[in-house]
């Protein structure tokens, strides 16, 4: 059953964030895993539908997952400042606090992987091991979709969207029945991409994993090389949307977190 907590807005006030804490059915004492979903997605779309809840349950893991502010069942804001990645990382820590968990393994996908990097930097004691899924070389460079995605999300007529990448985000957001104004604000959030010096301070073991044909993220190796001891994996013949639930991804993630 889902629960909720209140998290701070940038300029005062709070937003309601919905989360789930699913105890391992086997009663196993393994480290809990916190799942951090991607942009325009939700805990259900990113983790339940691809079978991650089942996979972690079979591994005896306690699963903690939540909907980012502005996504899924969580409360939305239309102010970009409310989606600052420092706030999103603090939400992760707040969810762990609500579940009385001091330290967890963390698996973030796409935007969730960006937030996981910020969690590793701002709250390092909360992360035992981390998986950065659907994130790679393109994290290190400005997104070519910086302006086109929010424009596509706010377009009155989707048929007028000419950028194929931006159109894909609009189609996905519509399929999820998300608040597109909130998503546009989230995309325009204040971003502080961690540079080489910051990434070099990460001490937790990290796995960077991407689909072979993922044009959104690029190759995992350039990002992994900047994080001390990080591993890089490529999921053959998979793109940004299909890599997340692939068997190769699941085997690699479960093996890494159990190491």
Regions found by a protein language model. Give the residues of each.
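Hydrophobic, aromatic-rich cap/lid helix
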Residues: 170-195
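Flexible "cap/lid" loop of the alpha/beta hydrolase fold
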Residues: 114-157
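Conserved HGGG/HGGXW glycine-rich cap/lid loop of the alpha/beta-hydrolase fold
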Residues: 15-75
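Conserved alpha/beta-hydrolase "acid-adjacent" motif
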Residues: 215-220
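Conserved acidic catalytic loop of the alpha/beta-hydrolase fold
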Residues: 86-104
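Catalytic histidine-centered segment of alpha/beta-hydrolase-like enzymes
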Residues: 238-250
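N-terminal cap/lid segment of alpha/beta-hydrolase-fold proteins
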Residues: 1-17
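Short beta-strand/loop motif that positions the catalytic acidic residue
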Residues: 202, 208-210
């Amino acid at each position: 059953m889902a629960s909720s907590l209140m998290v701070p807005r940038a300029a005062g006030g709070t937003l309601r964030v919905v989360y789930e804490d699913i105890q391992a059915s086997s009663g196993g004492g393994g480290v809990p895993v916190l799942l951090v979903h991607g942009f325009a997605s939700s805990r259900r779309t990113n983790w339940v539908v691809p079978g991650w809840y089942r996979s972690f349950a079979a591994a005896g893991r306690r699963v903690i997952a939540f909907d980012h502010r502005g996504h899924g069942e969580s409360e939305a804001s239309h102010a970009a400042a409310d989606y600052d990645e420092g706030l999103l990382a603090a939400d992760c820590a707040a969810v762990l606090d609500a579940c009385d968990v001091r330290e967890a393994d963390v698996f973030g996908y796409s935007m969730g992987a960006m937030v996981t990097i910020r969690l590793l930097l701002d709250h390092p004691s909360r992360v035992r091991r981390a998986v950065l899924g659907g994130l790679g070389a393109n994290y290190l460079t400005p997104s070519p979709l910086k302006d086109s995605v929010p424009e596509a999300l706010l377009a009155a007529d989707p048929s007028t969207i000419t950028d194929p990448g931006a159109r894909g985000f609009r189609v996905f957001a519509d399929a999820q029945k998300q608040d597109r104004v909130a998503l546009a604000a989230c995309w325009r959030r204040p971003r502080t991409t961690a540079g080489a010096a910051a990434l070099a301070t990460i001490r937790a073991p990290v796995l960077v994993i991407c689909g072979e044909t993922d044009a959104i993220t690029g190759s995992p190796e350039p990002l992994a090389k900047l994080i001390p001891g990080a591993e890089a994996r490529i999921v053959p013949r998979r793109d940004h949307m299909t890599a997340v639930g692939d068997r190769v991804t699941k085997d690699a993630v479960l093996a890494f977190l159990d190491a």
